[in-house]
Amino acid sequence: MPARWGCLFPGKYPCQTGLRHMSDRASVIYILDDDNAVLEALSSLVRSIGLSVECFSSASVFLNDVNRSACGCLILDVRMPEMSGLDVQRQLKELGEQIPIIFISGHGDIPMAVKAIKAGAVDFFTKPFREEELLGAIRAALKLAPQQRSNAPRVSELKENYESLSKREQQVLKFVLRGYLNKQTALELDISEATVKVHRHNIMRKMKVSSIQDLVRVTERLKDSLE
């Protein structure tokens, strides 16, 4: 094992035992780290079990060039000079990208790990770590990826849905999100309660949701792009 890999995997490299079932050529494992030696070590490990890999050393290049239609996961370094891993995670969320993320860090930063997990990360590893643990996290992430993509329309699509609302429907939506009843909304906008009900029906249809809870969820995702 080359010496530089020892900082990642304390043991024999690579471990092949019992991992063939993880091979999924339809999935892409993205690796974002500013250390080329780490990129080489991680990509070699992932390729050894038959998975496709795309490596990036720049956060901005990754955010601009990544194939967003591909299903897979992202192995993400926490500390990078251009942009932190948490910032990358936040930007992906703002873009509506639901790719599962596995964080790696050279420091035992518990508060940062808590933030990452709370924001939806699959796992958080501190170097060195066992390769079996990372491969297990990749396995879990690949199980999550199709479900997340099928259940989460992109922000661009949600914004398009929002912009299809009439000015009055957008006004009604604001009161719906504040928890106003139809009667209260009608008084605020000086329209009939029946008209409010029609607007609410149209809002739900255009936003492609079936419940107020879903409406709140999608508009929360839109908040940053509408401000």
From Swiss-Prot:
Keywords: Activator, Cytoplasm, DNA-binding, Phosphoprotein, Transcription, Transcription regulation, Two-component regulatory system. Residues 28-142 form the Response regulatory domain. Phosphorylation by TodS probably induces conformational changes, which allow or alter the interaction with RNA polymerase in a process assisted by the integration host factor (IHF). SMART domains: HTH_LUXR (SM00421), REC (SM00448). The keyword DNA repair does not apply. Residues 158-223 form the HTH luxR-type domain. Changing D77A: Lack of phosphorylation. GO terms for cellular component: cytoplasm; protein-DNA complex. One of its GO terms (biological process) is phosphorelay signal transduction system. The keyword Cytoplasm applies. InterPro entries: CheY-like_superfamily, Sig_transdc_resp-reg_C-effctor, Sig_transdc_resp-reg_receiver, Tscrpt_reg_LuxR_C, WH-like_DNA-bd_sf. Its main location: cytoplasm. Residues 182-201 bind DNA. It is found in: Cytoplasm. Monomer. This is Response regulator protein TodT. It comes from Pseudomonas putida (strain DOT-T1E).
